[in-house]
Amino acid sequence: MKSRGLSVSTTNEHPDSQRLLADPLAGSESWWQQIAQWGTPLVEPISEDKVRLTFLWREPVAGADEPTYSRVYIDVNGVTDHHSTHPETLQRLGQTHVWYWQAEVESDFRGSYSFMPVTAEHCLNLPEGTPQERRQAQRNWWISLMDLAQNDPFNHTAPHSSYRGRPLSAVHLADAIPQTAWQPIDAGQQLPTDTQRLQLITWHSELLGNSRNVWIYHTHGTEDNAERPLAILLDGQYWATRQPIFGVLDNETDAGRLPASVYVLIDIIDQPHRSVELPCNQDFWQALQTELLPQVAALQPFTDQASRTVVAGQSFGWVGLAICRITLAAAFWWCAESSPVPSGGRMLIISKL
């Protein structure tokens, strides 16, 4: 998923969620009207640097065309584990149409989330098999839920979507680092793109044996063109078309928070190519360095200093940029799903690539 932010919190604080859930009027129209006024998720401070989030989902009144839901799964970026064989689900509040889920997070949390209500036949039911077979079955099941995902209609921030097109809502807590350039977009507005500074090329890669779109954008500045920093954005089609980032980059540059730079947004072609090229694929990075970047430099010069070059990605894209960084390293370590995580801590070094 994606993280954006306002200069202020986009969720509202409620002093006592347990009292709210115990209210005899819970689930009534007046109760939901109050929720809509507050906005969700509800936020309760529980310590100096932690808060409790309460997510709420309103089940539609069952009708002839309305399914009966058995579970409402929730995916909160950086909080829930979508690899788990026991994924997080909301609880139904008594016999009402209220479903809820709570989590404790840092008070500077920012992230996206979605609800996935399912009928009985869509609930997770893993077959017998090897650990690898069960992991693959779990992954296939999770991907199948993407078409069922919903954003949160009670969230006051404008909804957005993932690179797969999954509907998402955002949480921006009060202590999160300000990202004010996104404020118009979070309010449902669009920022203009200066098309005179946007170039779309087709990268025909002999090494990879494929072709794809690449967007090149440069922001205004007084720096010598040959010294401009370079930023490479993986999943470039998302940032170029689904959630255009060009206006945000202009705003950040004009405000002096970013230097005038050259941005290269690389299309994934499709999901199968993304799954092959981004994680642990040295050929992809070799092709990028020897084929694509010289083409980009001929159109928009940039520095060759590694210290002024950035690669940004998420999920497979994050793995890809990590591989880019450590291609020449003797070893790289990452977390294995089967390894136990120490109580109260995070796993740092588990298995070797």
From Swiss-Prot:
A GO term for molecular function: iron ion binding
Compartment(s) where it occurs, according to its Swiss-Prot or TrEMBL record: Cytoplasm
Knockout-associated phenotype: Disruption of the gene abrogates enterochelin-supported growth on iron-chelated media.
A GO-annotated cellular component: cytoplasm
Transmembrane segments: none
Gene Ontology biological-process annotations: iron ion transport
A matching Pfam family: Enterochelin_N
Function as written in the Swiss-Prot or TrEMBL entry: Catalyzes the hydrolysis of ferric enterobactin (Fe-Ent). Is responsible for the release of iron from ferric enterobactin.
Protein name: Iron(III) enterobactin esterase
Annotated source species: Yersinia enterocolitica
Gene name linked to the record: fes
